[in-house]
């Protein structure tokens, strides 16, 4: 029975645990392939909250919210600002289609802080012509950029 299970589930052992500790991850934005490589774990924000993904994760499709992406590779951790989009999670890979993604070296801290201040002012003003959802998203993006630098 164990041999049958292994043939049907080559990525898992007899007790259903993932044997492979890394998985493929590809992050694509309209401008470029932002990242393509292997990771031990990926953490990012979804519309349902923060998620941490390891190899062998159940298949899942999620909507991304702006936040910090943390990739744990065998050589260490990498952080980036990840904006809205979608992620398809499979047991051996993650595919992320994002509106934008930025490494810390690509982020202008002064610009991000100014964007955060503007978004907070728009949200506090409660003006009838303010698109609240758009202002909230702008605030989340600015905070993600700042957090990715920490």
Question: Where are the predicted features?
Answer:
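Residue-identity detector for glutamine
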Residues: 8-11, 93, 116, 124
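Intrinsically disordered, low-complexity segments enriched in polar/charged small residues
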Residues: 16-17, 62, 70, 127, ...
């Amino acid at each position: 029975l164990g041999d049958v299970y292994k043939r049907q589930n080559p990525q898992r052992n007899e007790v259903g645990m993932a044997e492979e500790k890394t998985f493929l991850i590809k992050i694509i934005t309209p401008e470029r392939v932002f990242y393509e490589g292997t990771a031990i774990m990926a953490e990012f924000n979804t519309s349902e909250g923060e998620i941490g993904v390891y190899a062998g994760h159940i298949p899942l499709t999620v909507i991304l919210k702006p936040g910090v992406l943390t990739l744990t590779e065998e050589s260490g951790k990498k952080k980036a600002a990840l904006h809205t989009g979608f992620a398809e999670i499979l047991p051996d890979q993650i595919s992320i289609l994002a509106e934008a993604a930025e490494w810390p070296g690509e982020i202008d801290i002064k610009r991000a802080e100014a964007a955060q201040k503007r978004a907070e002012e728009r949200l506090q003003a409660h003006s009838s012509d303010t698109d609240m959802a758009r202002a909230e998203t702008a605030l989340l993006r600015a905070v993600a950029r700042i957090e990715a630098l920490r």
